[in-house]
Swiss-Prot record:
This is Cell division protein FtsA. Belongs to the FtsA/MreB family. Signal peptide: none annotated. Residues 425-434 have a biased composition (Acidic residues). It comes from Staphylococcus aureus (strain MRSA252). It holds the Pfam family FtsA. The gene is ftsA.
Amino acid sequence: MEEHYYVSIDIGSSSVKTIVGEKFHNGINVIGTGQTYTSGIKNGLIDDFDIARQAIKDTIKKASIASGVDIKEVFLKLPIIGTEVYDESNEIDFYEDTEINGSHIEKVLEGIREKNDVQETEVINVFPIRFIVDKENEVSDPKELIARHSLKVEAGVIAIQKSILINMIKCVEACGVDVLDVYSDAYNYGSILTATEKELGACVIDIGEDVTQVAFYERGELVDADSIEMAGRDITDDIAQGLNTSYETAEKVKHQYGHAFYDSASDQDIFTVEQVDSDETVQYTQKDLSDFIEARVEEIFFEVFDVLQDLGLTKVNGGFIVTGGSANLLGVKELLSDMVSEKVRIHTPSQMGIRKPEFSSAISTISSSIAFDELLDYVTINYHDNEETEEDVIDVKDKDNESKLGGFDWFKRKTNKKDTHENEVESSDEEIYQSEDNHQEHKQNHEHVQDKDKEESKFKKLMKSLFE
């Protein structure tokens, strides 16, 4: 992967998604995507290694063909499972006037990772809240400033269970690619919020296949995150049981006729389903179906409210932002709006080819990767002269200004620590050919970004640090 291309992998419970993108002015230009449905993932974690590996491999291949990029290095998304979020600080001293650069920022953040003393967990992301130069000058990005005495950082930290981390990376790297870094969904969700939402206090609700993830942001920063083992699969199970039909039929009916808000569902939209205990077919209306869907989605939202209460979060002045595959259901916004007084919106990525809520996590991982690289001066992006339309990019300006950092990159210096069903994203042949043509044009017009040393495989470094 050339430095100006970013490849993200989102291993979800229903499918694996890969996006190839690049920084493009104030947004991300999506060059190619891949999606493969799989039964090898349960609750966001590896359930069957071989099945999951094949799905990941197939998805990478699809994205490579669509983008024309030979994918060798990737950024991996991690779920909010087995995750802890907390605050920490660290300070480094200077003994002469020093111009602060990316290596100094990396060093002060590295010290935070080393402070982790919770067994069986590993710090994966550190996101600076503020930097303090010479004990009194608070800044968001200290690069190029002169420090006479010290650089301090006050930061949020995301740690995850080591077993989850190791198995996810191992499965991806078994596909012949290197994991350059990992980013928690708790961290990634910041890029789908507006500056106002993050400042006032916003709750992201990502309703996936097996897991619903919750993250709360306030005053511009991640406050806490958690997950609920209730999501889209439970909705389908309820439909199958309520309509006395198979799970597969219930899934199709959910996507074709599903509505999460009973009051808005139609009693004129009629469909038939086969019964599991007879050869008969029975007719139902969308309103009949909505009765089952609304009850389960409502229960999911009540579980979210319980999570917020358990975290001590009682005000959501910035509103609720719902995303994930199950956010595709009609009526989700109306139902939640009926349950709360705060603003509610459904988040869908803006780029062509990924305009579905289930791609929010994958594109957000690229946003995190760009913010991380620019904070540490790993790359210097030379922008295209070409003009882009608003629909082709997603704004990452807020993410850049936050100066967040993903911390798993620090593993490369860590040593001696003791301790099959597939389906491609819909795209026409014309879009694929156009992507390949665009790739050739990018290669001609792009100036290469600054080179950095070839990194050894994250998984190999991690295994060395854990078992040597």
